[in-house]
């Protein structure tokens, strides 16, 4: 096993003391046992727990084979999905690939350009994307359990038409890959009818926990990232976080501290990074915790920030605003690349004291200074140390946060594996759009909107 993630809770004191963590140990252990024995709410959606070791090896091999086909066939790869159907893969690709992977010259890339669609209903976004890719060789991965989710269904209609016009029906079917239910749903029916290659979304894995299934693995593999290393990292994390000793289990300690802070009125957790490539990891994390904990009038509100950028916009509020915040910093110990700051003879900017230092050194001092400043301002800080941003540590991070999320949801007394609240806006939207069966509701809503 490589070096693991490590947790520094020094700057959560005096808000949470060690005896409070120890007090929660037996409760957390009980919640973990509930997860493991599959006796709690949502127990039909716990397939993610053993995915790192019990994944479908035959399908995994097909994913890698399909990824090679896509890389050899296409200039552009379009990933169509929303929420958990795209955030995990995008988080991995942005974290591990070149920051400007889509802008590199073709001779500098060994993989297609990768763009995401079906995660909004903006006509401008779609029109701009179509304009960008219309003259390129395109492959599409449409990801939807049902095939009827509005955003990806609209996007797939548009790209299916584009590909069939461009390549004909036979040519298009070789370029469309569907990740969907094993046996039922509109997308499964269409894929079988048209002859698309398909990959299965397991019945026992919810969308926001699905990054280690074909949902995330096919786009990640197309990007050139080593999916074997991702699974290895997740498997090692699964083993490490199986300990029931709170002194050794960082998942237990993270759950204990964030929930102790929540009980003391710290109702917002900010996941903070100092690497721009972690932006979409923050978006993935927000969905994971927002949908899992935010119900029954409960839950820690998940926010994310990209420092030092957001220190120049949100820094004032974090330092002196409402004291209901705590932060979880992702500290990347070793950057992928280094840049040395050179000496300047004029020194008009006064920065020669940084000459011959690595930019990453400056970045780390900014992180350390921010932790101290915010702590002085009444904001507790959890620091999660990550040795480097690689496929292996992406797998570790995913499993760390997923397991912590499951335990934390049970600790708060909610079902962390459903999301009934997301249906409310959909019903209103369908009624206002005139979907058959919503006629009475449409009239009521139109009256309310006057």
Swiss-Prot record:
Biological function: Catalyzes the reversible isomerization of glucose-6-phosphate to fructose-6-phosphate.
Cited SUPFAM superfamilies: SIS domain
A GO biological process held by the record: gluconeogenesis
Lineage summary: Bacteria, Bacillati, Bacillota, Clostridia, Eubacteriales
Reactions mediated catalytically: alpha-D-glucose 6-phosphate = beta-D-fructose 6-phosphate
E.C. code: 5.3.1.9
Annotated GO CC locations: cytosol
EC top class named in words: isomerase
Major site of localization recorded for this protein: cytoplasm
Record-given protein name: Glucose-6-phosphate isomerase
Pathway linked to the protein: Carbohydrate biosynthesis; gluconeogenesis; Carbohydrate degradation; glycolysis; D-glyceraldehyde 3-phosphate and glycerone phosphate from D-glucose: step 2/4
Source species: Clostridium botulinum (strain Okra / Type B1)
């Amino acid at each position: 096993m490589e070096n693991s993630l490590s947790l520094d809770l020094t700057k959560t004191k005096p808000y949470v003391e060690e005896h409070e963590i120890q007090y929660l140990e037996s409760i957390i252990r009980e919640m973990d046992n509930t997860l493991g024995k599959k006796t709690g709410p949502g127990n039909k959606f716990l397939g993610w727990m053993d995915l790192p070791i019990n994944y479908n090896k035959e399908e995994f091999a097909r994913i890698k084979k399909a990824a090679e086909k896509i890389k050899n066939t296409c200039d552009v790869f379009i990933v169509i999905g929303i929420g958990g159907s795209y955030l995990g893969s995008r988080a991995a690709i942005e974290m591990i690939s070149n920051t400007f992977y889509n802008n590199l010259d073709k001779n500098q890339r060994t993989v297609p350009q990768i763009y995401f669609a079906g995660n909004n209903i903006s006509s401008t976004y779609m029109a701009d994307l179509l304009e960008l890719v219309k003259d390129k060789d395109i492959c599409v991965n449409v990801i939807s359990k049902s095939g009827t989710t509005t955003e990806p269904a609209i996007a797939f209609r548009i790209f299916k038409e584009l590909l069939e016009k461009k390549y004909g029906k036979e040519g298009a079917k070789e370029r469309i890959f569907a990740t969907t239910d094993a046996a039922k749903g509109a997308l499964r029916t269409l894929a079988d009818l048209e002859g698309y290659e398909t990959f299965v979304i397991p019945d026992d894995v919810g969308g926001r926990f699905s990054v280690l299934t074909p949902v995330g693995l096919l786009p990640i593999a197309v990007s050139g990232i080593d999916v074997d290393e991702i699974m290895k990292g997740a498997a090692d994390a699964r083993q490490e976080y199986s300990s029931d000793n709170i002194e050794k289990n960082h998942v237990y300690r993270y759950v204990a501290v964030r929930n102790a802070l929540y009980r003391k009125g710290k109702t917002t957790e900010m996941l903070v990074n100092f690497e721009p490539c972690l932006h979409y990891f923050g978006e993935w994390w927000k969905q994971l915790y927002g949908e899992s904990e935010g119900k029954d009038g409960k839950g820690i509100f998940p926010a994310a920030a990209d420092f030092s950028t957001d220190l120049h916009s949100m820094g004032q509020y974090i330092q002196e605003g409402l004291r209901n915040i705590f932060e979880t910093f992702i500290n990347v110990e070793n950057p992928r690349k280094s840049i040395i700051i050179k000496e300047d003879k004029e020194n008009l900017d006064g920065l020669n004291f940084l000459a011959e230092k690595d930019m990453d050194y400056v970045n780390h001092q900014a992180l350390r200074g921010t932790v101290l400043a915010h702590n002085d301002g009444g904001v507790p800080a959890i620091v999660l140390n990550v040795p480097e941003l690689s496929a292996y540590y992406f797998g570790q991070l995913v499993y760390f946060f997923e397991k912590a999320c499951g335990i934390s949801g049970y600790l708060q007394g909610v079902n962390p594996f459903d999301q009934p609240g997301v249906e409310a806006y959909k019903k209103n939207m369908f009624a206002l759009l005139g979907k058959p069966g919503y006629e009475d509701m449409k009239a009521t809503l139109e009256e309310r909107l006057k």
